[in-house]
Amino acid sequence: MAQVINTNSLSLLTQNNLNKSQSALGTAIERLSSGLRINSAKDDAAGQAIANRFTANIKGLTQASRNANDGISIAQTTEGALNEINNNLQRVRELAVQSANSTNSQSDLDSIQAEITQRLNEIDRVSGQTQFNGVKVLAQDNTLTIQVGANDGETIDIDLKQINSQTLGLDTLNVQKKYDVSDTAVAASYSDSKQNIAVPDKTAITAKIGAATSGGAGIKADISFKDGKYYATVSGYDDAADTDKNGTYEVTVAADTGAVTFATTPTVVDLPTDAKAVSKVQQNDTEIAATNAKAALKAAGVADAEADTATLVKMSYTDNNGKVIDGGFAFKTSGGYYAASVDKSGAASLKVTSYVDATTGTEKTAANKLGGADGKTEVVTIDGKTYNASKAAGHNFKAQPELAEAAATTTENPLQKIDAALAQVDALRSDLGAVQNRFNSAITNLGNTVNNLSSARSRIEDSDYATEVSNMSRAQILQQAGTSVLAQANQVPQNVLSLLR
């Protein structure tokens, strides 16, 4: 080897090795201090990508486990409410068994019915007020989707059902032998709704029946329902030769076409006249199919096509025992109340009566208006409830309709109805119990998956302290040795001085 001064190759070689050992020492210290083998992508590019995917799955599955626990909580909340409803139903059944005994006086039956009513009202309260995090669990049919996985579509559904006295078929449960009908009407109350629709003005709409005589133009027929049959009370027939045509006619509905025809002669029938007043008219939250309602009103003989504001409302009455009896739906306008119906999809439509015009022979439709002239009796049945238009307690029915509970008879087979209600509650409780077990199984599986994924990720990105401590010790020794050797390598050029002496 040549003896040179300008270039100290041994020193450069030693410095290079010293830098390597220093880098190795830094890596070992970083891994020991962080606990991670991969602190950046340069440590292991492929391993970093794999570990990152594992982290996403682990975090998602951990949250999914919490979601499943929330699902258990909402199922338990619902089941707790159903348990209380079941307790009330058991008491109602006990009272129904007691009422079936002929030794009971009317006073005894009234007391039994009063408690039954209170129990049913409590069922309705539990149904309407039980909620979990703002979700009313028994107020309506609803499906809750619980995310129990880290990816799309990994869900479990909780099917909730509306459970109240009406859906249980017990809203008209009556074990009394009589039903008191009040002679005094109670004023209806209504709060304006923000959910309005545009429909034509419907003042003075009635079902008109044409006739071949001069008196036919003024004929009006008021539609009613009793014992499974429709009747039309005809008035306004002013032909002197045919005044006996005023009266009540049976109405027949054709099975194939749905057309309505009237009997040729009046019949004697006692239509419901006793009425209790509507005590509540509430806004219905259902979205209204305004276009369909408007078209139906026009087809029903609406005279004025100018737009008017109407609101879909639902009427109800609270009887002497405190039982809320639901009425039907109606459109409330400035002209009064008009019979309406709401299907399962939430669409509202006008209820109409079909009839055949005796003059033209054509089939027509007429809207059922809940109301009429002051003092005039006009009865319309909506969804099994009878509304009476007669003037009562000095109020005008045009503004405030009355609810006549004509079917105030003792419920047939009350125990059978209550048993069916209990079975309905039991079915929902069974579903909730099954879904809770399913959630528990999902949570166990999620826990196992998280553990296995965490172990797999650990093997990729966590530091092996035995290895890293060994690497650090080796690097430290190399650093010390390198430093010592570098000092000696730097002295090698001084050997040239001996040649210059």
UniProtKB/Swiss-Prot annotation:
GO terms for cellular component: bacterial-type flagellum; extracellular region. The gene is fliC. It comes from Salmonella choleraesuis (strain SC-B67). Pfam families: Flagellin_C (PF00700), Flagellin_D3 (PF08884), Flagellin_N (PF00669), FLIC_barrel (PF21504). Belongs to the bacterial flagellin family. This is Flagellin. It is found in: Secreted; Bacterial flagellum. Individual Salmonella serotypes usually alternate between the production of 2 antigenic forms of flagella, termed phase 1 and phase 2, each specified by separate structural genes. InterPro entries: Flagellin, Flagellin_C, Flagellin_C_sub2, Flagellin_D3, Flagellin_N, FLIC_barrel. It comes from the Bacteria. SUPFAM superfamilies: Phase 1 flagellin. Its main location: secreted. Gene3D superfamilies: 6.10.280.190, f41 fragment of flagellin, C-terminal domain, f41 fragment of flagellin, middle domain, f41 fragment of flagellin, N-terminal domain, Flagellar export chaperone, C-terminal domain. Flagellin is the subunit protein which polymerizes to form the filaments of bacterial flagella. Transmembrane segments: none annotated. Keywords: Bacterial flagellum, Secreted. One of its GO terms (molecular function) is structural molecule activity.
